[in-house]
């Protein structure tokens, strides 16, 4: 998309600009669009996450790949972050679960499509709620949870559980490191023995254990 041309056109303006994610799951491309606008003097920036195109068969129209959105959020925590569950899901039946997941991850808002008569909408009819359904979703079905708590009981319990996770993570990293060393030795042994990288029977045996 022609981000630089848009950035040039917006020079000298004082309007908020929200940058949707690129079609492909490319964090640097998303950040690059934000940086171009920022260099053009656009200071009121925000982002909209609507999922990424994928060749995999998934329940949603677009793949959320939340890890990319979370990474962008961690790098630029000051940016308002909205999620578009309508386009991400591609159907009204997914709007609630995507919306709740977005709020649980701490994103600021949602961009949800609504239409007075969705069946007569010229485009994307399957993903549009009626105004009444939107009202019910926002005020009756979704929950905004606290980001943190000052409760001593909460802090004690969460610190205890996180300490357990830290120990498990250390053990996992050690085990993975040990596995990599053995894998490297196997690779060297195959090379020295003039053996192909892949033995299908071994690969099938590994998959059978999963």
Please place each PLM-identified region on the residue numbering:
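Domain-level signature for soluble enzymes in the chorismate/prephenate branch of the shikimate pathway
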Residues: 146-210
């Amino acid at each position: 998309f022609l981000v630089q041309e848009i950035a040039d056109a917006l020079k000298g303006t004082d309007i908020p600009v929200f940058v949707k994610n690129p079609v492909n799951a490319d964090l640097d491309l998303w950040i690059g669009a934000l940086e171009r606008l920022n260099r053009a003097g656009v200071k009121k920036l925000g982002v909209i996450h609507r999922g990424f195109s994928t060749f995999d068969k998934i329940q949603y129209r677009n793949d959320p790949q939340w890890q990319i959105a979370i990474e962008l959020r961690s790098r630029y925590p000051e940016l308002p972050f909205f999620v578009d569950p309508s386009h991400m899901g591609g159907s009204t039946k997914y709007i609630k679960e995507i919306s709740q997941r977005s709020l649980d991850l701490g994103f600021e808002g949602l961009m949800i499509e609504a239409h007075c008569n969705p069946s007569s909408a010229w485009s994307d009819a399957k993903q549009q709620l009626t105004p009444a359904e939107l009202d019910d979703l926002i005020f009756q079905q979704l929950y905004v949870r606290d980001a943190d708590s000052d409760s001593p009981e909460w802090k004690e319990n969460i610190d205890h559980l996180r300490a357990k996770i830290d120990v498990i993570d250390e053990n996992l990293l050690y085990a993975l490191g040990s596995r990599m060393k053995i894998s490297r030795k196997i690779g060297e042994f195959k090379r020295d023995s003039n053996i192909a990288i892949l033995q299908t029977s071994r690969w099938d045996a590994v998959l059978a254990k999963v």
